[in-house]
């Protein structure tokens, strides 16, 4: 028997990201991405059983990373995971990650002064923060119902959509208990896919939507539907950037990441000059000075 899986374009194993000396900030962003992945899997009822950096692929996602499970040989799909199963998976993740970071230290890819135990603890902290935000009930006073929307907005900031929310009142009706019931990852990704057909990671998609709204404001398109604005934005902003990338540089980064980096480059150029810089000039500068220095991903 043979199992054929789809190739995940522009993805990297963690050792490729550590092929040069990296900063603790990069390590933290990788662990944040892995924590999000683990929470998503546990919400689906998947016990991984072998959580590690080695069994994960990473894709650049604007200034962050997105993580993908690539080895599910030890995984078990259940209707719902117990707290003990989740905690075992999480403890295994911490143990494996600390060991992998020690290997990187021994190879000179991570500074000897870095506390790998503390870095490994980060995935536990981040996981618990996310799990609490996504699943735990919250008590709110009956006259502060606006906090329901605040909870939903916080979940969206984390990249999750709330499909259903339960709300019950305490005896006496002075406080409500709210709890997310159906939570789906990829809130901004789905919006961008629906509006443009672009398959972007979550933070990339969020950056695109922010730029789309800025485009609406600059061109005074308040009366136009979001679909119309998105079409014009694609034609005037996104597509010119992607088309400008020569074939020999197209394997460096995926189009949504290139778009994000062009926006970053535009910001730095504007800061340096103290004024706005035309997009054509920004693209030319980025393709000449920045993208050629990237490795093929």
Residue ranges of each PLM-predicted region?
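Regulatory N- and C-terminal appendages and interdomain linkers associated
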Residues: 101-297
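Short, polar/flexible loop-turn hinges at active-site or ligand-entry regions and domain interfaces
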Residues: 22-24, 76-80, 104-109, 252
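Conserved kinase catalytic-core helix
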Residues: 20-49, 53-54, 90, 94
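Conserved structural core of kinase catalytic domains
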Residues: 1-31
């Amino acid at each position: 028997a043979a199992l054929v899986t789809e190739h995940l374009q522009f993805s990297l194993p963690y050792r490729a990201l550590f092929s040069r000396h990296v900063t603790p900030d990069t390590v933290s962003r990788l662990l944040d991405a892995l924590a999000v992945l683990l929470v998503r899997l546990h919400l689906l009822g998947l016990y991984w059983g072998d959580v590690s950096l080695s069994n994960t692929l990473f894709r650049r996602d604007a200034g962050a990373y997105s993580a993908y499970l690539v080895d599910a040989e030890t995984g078990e799909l259940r209707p719902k995971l117990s707290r003990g199963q989740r905690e075992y998976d999480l403890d295994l993740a911490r143990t494996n990650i600390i060991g992998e970071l020690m290997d990187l230290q021994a190879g000179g890819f991570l500074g000897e002064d870095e506390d790998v135990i503390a870095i490994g603890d980060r995935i536990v902290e981040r996981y618990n923060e996310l799990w609490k935000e996504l699943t735990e009930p919250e008590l709110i006073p009956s006259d502060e119902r606006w906090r329901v929307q605040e909870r939903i907005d916080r979940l969206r900031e984390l990249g999750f959509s709330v499909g259903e929310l339960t709300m019950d009142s305490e005896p006496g009706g002075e406080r409500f208990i709210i709890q997310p019931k159906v939570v789906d990852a990829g809130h901004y990704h789905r919006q961008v896919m629906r509006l443009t057909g672009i398959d972007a990671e979550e933070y990339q998609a969020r950056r695109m939507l922010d730029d789309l709204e800025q485009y609406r404001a600059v061109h005074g398109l308040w009366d136009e539907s979001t679909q119309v604005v998105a079409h014009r934005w694609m034609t005037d902003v996104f597509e010119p950037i992607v088309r400008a990338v020569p074939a020999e540089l197209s394997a460096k980064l995926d189009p949504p990441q290139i778009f994000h980096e062009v926006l970053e480059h535009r910001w730095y150029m504007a800061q340096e000059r103290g004024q706005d810089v035309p997009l054509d000039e920004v693209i030319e500068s980025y393709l000449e000075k920045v993208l050629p220095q990237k490795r093929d991903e």
